[in-house]
A protein has these predicted regions:
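Beta-rich catalytic cores
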Residues: 4, 43-44, 66, 95-97, ...
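Short, small-residue-biased leader/transition segments that mark boundaries at the very start
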Residues: 1-8
Length: 258
């Protein structure tokens, strides 16, 4: 028997969608958690996002002649559109953790993994909205493909975008350069940007990594066992955490962007 390994869940007006990574299907439920149907696709789905009443899919290489990075489907699994075809000459270094979707209220941005061009949808048309420029550290996408390189090698000379997050009027991007994780914060109103590190002022030495962005709130979390083991002083200093057990739910940190 194969048990579902749900790696993502998303929702829209039509219900809740769970991505079963191992069996490569999307389980559709209504808001009473009544099962509706399984959605199957002829390609390998690794990330999903709901846009209004539709589902955006990000896929891995499938080796077929028709191989696109993104697909737009309706809630029944019918493909409505395809975006950004893959080059068959791409290398194999493609599966490294990074997100490809970010959404906040009515704003939606997507980008192929490690790509410096960020897109949005106008109706169902993919439209470039931002291009990242790391100056002399920008990967030369027009001359070669990043999947032919080991970007985790310390000798890799370029900066590679990892995750993207929309937070009200800000676009937050993280990248790794010479084994150090950096953040790039762009104010979409003033068009000003800042580069550097972001520290977690709630727990000293705890890494900062947004998990969810909603309105002007940036949400991070840590599992209870790790908090107890690695940051016992936090548990001792906060009365609300005194009865914390290793099996308890994760602890959330909620930040308000200024």
């Amino acid at each position: 028997t194969l048990f579902p390994y749900t790696t993502l869940f998303r929702s829209n007006s039509q219900g809740i969608y769970l991505l079963d990574y191992t069996q490569q299907k999307i389980l559709h439920y209504d808001y009473d958690w009544k099962f509706q149907k399984d959605l199957y696709f002829p390609f390998y789905v690794s990330e999903i996002n709901c846009i209004h009443d539709k589902i955006m899919l990000y896929t891995e290489r499938n080796g077929e002649k028709e191989d696109y990075q993104f697909y737009l489907a309706d809630n029944c699994g019918k493909i409505l559109n395809r975006y950004l075809p893959r080059n068959n000459n791409w290398g194999n270094n493609t599966f490294i953790t990074s997100n490809v979707f970010t959404q906040n209220n009515n704003s939606f941005i997507f980008a192929p993994r490690f790509n410096n061009t960020l897109y949005t949808l106008h109706d169902t048309i993919a439209t470039p909205i931002y291009t990242l420029n790391f100056r002399d550290k920008t990967f030369p996408e027009e001359r070669t493909n990043i999947t032919k390189y080991d970007i985790n090698d310390n000798k890799f000379p370029y900066i590679v975008r990892r995750n993207i997050f929309l937070c009200n009027n800000y676009l937050l991007i993280d990248y790794v350069y010479q084994d150090k994780r950096n953040f790039y914060l762009y104010d979409m109103n003033s068009h000003k940007s800042q580069n550097g590190y972001i520290t977690n002022d709630l727990i000293t030495d705890f890494r900062f990594f947004p998990q969810i962005v909603k309105d002007n709130k940036i949400i991070d979390w840590i599992d209870a066992a790790s908090l107890i083991e690695y940051f016992p002083h936090v548990v001792q200093e906060n009365p609300i955490l005194h009865d914390l057990k290793e099996t308890d739910n994760p602890i959330l940190f909620i930040y308000n962007s200024k």
